[in-house]
UniProtKB/Swiss-Prot annotation:
GO biological process: L-tryptophan biosynthetic process
Record keywords, A-Z: Amino-acid biosynthesis, Aromatic amino acid biosynthesis, Isomerase, Tryptophan biosynthesis
GO MF annotation, one: phosphoribosylanthranilate isomerase activity
Domain of life per record: Bacteria
InterPro entries according to UniProt: Aldolase_TIM, PRAI_dom, RibuloseP-bd_barrel, TrpF_fam
Reactions catalysed: N-(5-phospho-beta-D-ribosyl)anthranilate = 1-(2-carboxyphenylamino)-1-deoxy-D-ribulose 5-phosphate
Organism (species): Streptococcus gordonii (strain Challis / ATCC 35105 / BCRC 15272 / CH1 / DL1 / V288)
Similarity comment: family membership: Belongs to the TrpF family.
This protein's name: N-(5'-phosphoribosyl)anthranilate isomerase
Length: 195
């Protein structure tokens, strides 16, 4: 069954709702964003997460020190990296790594070292999908997440089209730029129940 990651969580109610509804992964954004959480916030929110749900820290072009501090303080299970960074960094992190790519056409230079890959729209967090028809997964050898413009209305189609390891949503479960608890539940239900 396809796994679910709810990303950009910043409140206790959103974390608890996602966990209770059956999310497999929850994401805390440490990069510059309206969804950004401080290390202190992430630590408090992480304490609400049961051991059955994996905590992911989301970073853009991080340093090793940034990653290590967040892993330690927020007890992260995985890190998700966007942007430019030295591939050698992947070997220095003692957590599985999700390497994110903004899909702008044909895939090229896809990491063979990352534990997971994530494919997102050209502008992450925009609520827009990338061109699904142009996506060629023949060179992908790791489990992968699909993100970018997903919501309860299109997630089943995305799963049927890509057969991904997991789907990842942030803006698709928001109303007026805030996490919507009902949309979180509906999204997870659509994935888990195949509705």
């Amino acid at each position: 069954m396809t796994k679910v990651k709810i990303c950009g969580l910043s409140t206790a109610s959103a974390v608890e709702t996602a966990c209770q509804a059956g999310a497999d992964y929850i994401g805390f954004v440490f990069a510059e964003s309206r969804r950004r959480v401080s290390l202190e916030q992430a630590q408090k929110l992480a304490a609400l997460v049961p051991s059955t749900v994996r905590k992911v820290g989301v970073f853009v072009s991080p340093s090793l020190a940034e990653l290590q501090e967040a892993i330690s303080v927020a007890n992260l299970d995985l890190v998700q990296i966007h942007g430019d960074f030295d591939e050698e960094l992947l070997t220095q992190i003692d957590r599985p790594v999700i390497q994110a790519y903004q899909v702008k056409g044909a895939l090229k230079d896809v990491s063979q070292q990352a534990d997971y890959l994530l494919f997102d729209a050209p502008l992450a967090g925009s609520g827009r999908t990338f061109d699904w028809q142009a996506f060629d997964k023949s060179q992908i050898h790791q489990p992968f997440f699909i993100a970018g413009g997903l919501n309860a209305g299109n997630v089943r189609e995305a799963i049927q089209h890509f057969a991904p390891y997991a789907v990842d949503v942030s803006s698709g479960v928001e109303t007026d730029a805030q996490k919507d608890l009902e949309k979180i539940k509906e999204f997870i239900e659509r994935v888990k129940d195949g509705i």
